[in-house]
Amino acid sequence: MDVTPIPGAALGAVVHGAHVTGDMDKTQFEEIWAALDAHLVLVFRGHRTPSYEEFLAFGRRFGYIPKTGLTSGAHPDHNEILIVSNLVEDGRKIGVGDAEWMGWHTDYSFRPRVSQVGFLEAVEVPSCGGETLFTDMYALYESLSPEERKRMHSYRVRHAMRTGYEETIEEKLQREVSLGGSGEQILPEDGTSTIHPLIARNPRTGRQSVYISTLNTERIVDLAPDDSRKLLDELLSHAGKPEHTYAHTWQPGDIVMWDQLGTVHAKQAFDPAELRVMRQVVSIFDDPTDPWHAEVAA
């Protein structure tokens, strides 16, 4: 397996020669983790196209893959696999998504059990547009002064599924749930709204990130609404800065794996007359409290 940093990119590396199934050996498994921690985004190329089952098994090597909870838009036999597309067949929408810009986010931040790693595979791509952008949110935290870091560690943030998507989620999962909130068992798929600390910590590397997004972050609950909006806008202005962002131009067969805790991602718009069809799985942390053991900055 060969890992090559992407020339001129702020983050990201291309991986050739990987065994993209669940039965990879321990050496490759550890090499992929190390590469992800170093580069945050990995682009797998030159591999045999995995079946749906192999794609799911590959993702499961890197954490628990929850079901999407969607009533439509997921693979009919494997609800864990999200179909992302603008495809319409016989008047019926296939998957979720459209050709418009999709704002900065990290998957499942509105659930108490947040995402750890994302996996997105390109099945069909448009001739232009549809790139996925990734911004390093560890870099944002590391740019803060010690005083700013200490203040940020005291804040909690409400995340919620974006308006208009609630009806696609199973009704029993539509609620606000927070870790330690009620003592009841929390299912991996539970929740469409939750509260998390503003600062997250990668349990493997110890790096800390500012855990917010434009798409799913509603407000900092410890601040007045106007103060919350002002600070969130200031922090989110980091997203998309070229010195901290990688724009991935898709090729059919690409599998991109990324650190969901330390990055946010967005999708560029494309011509709706063209097709963009992807399949995605997301792993969550085995211990849902792992991302929230951040130590207060000195």
Curated annotation (Swiss-Prot):
Taxonomic lineage:
Bacteria, Bacillati, Actinomycetota, Actinomycetes, Kitasatosporales
State the phenotype upon gene disruption.
Accumulation of pentalenolactone D and lack of production of pentalenolactone as well as the precursors pentalenolactones E and F.
Query: What would be an example GO MF term here?
Result: L-ascorbic acid binding
**Which cofactor does this sequence's record say it needs?**
Fe(2+)
Is Iron tagged as a keyword? Answer: yes
The reaction(s) this protein catalyses: pentalenolactone D + 2 2-oxoglutarate + 2 O2 = pentalenolactone F + 2 succinate + 2 CO2 + H2O
**Coiled-coil ranges from the UniProt annotation:** none
Pathway involvement?
A: Antibiotic biosynthesis; pentalenolactone biosynthesis
Q: Which UniProt keywords apply?
A: Antibiotic biosynthesis, Dioxygenase, Iron, Metal-binding, Oxidoreductase, Vitamin C
Record family assignment? Belongs to the TfdA dioxygenase family.
Cite the NCBIfam families for this sequence.
Neo-PentlctneFsynPtlD
Any one GO BP annotation for this protein? pentalenolactone biosynthetic process
Biological function = Catalyzes the Fe(2+) and alpha-ketoglutarate-dependent oxidation of pentalenolactone D to pentalenolactone F in the biosynthesis of pentalenolactone antibiotic. Also able to catalyze the oxidation of pentalenolactone D to pentalenolactone E.
Cofactor binding notes: Binds 1 Fe(2+) ion per subunit.
Q: Where does Fe cation bind?
A: 105, 107, 265
Disulfide topology: none
Q: What is this protein called?
A: Pentalenolactone F synthase
Question: A Pfam family this protein belongs to?
Answer: TauD
Control of this protein's activity is summarized as: Activated by ascorbate.
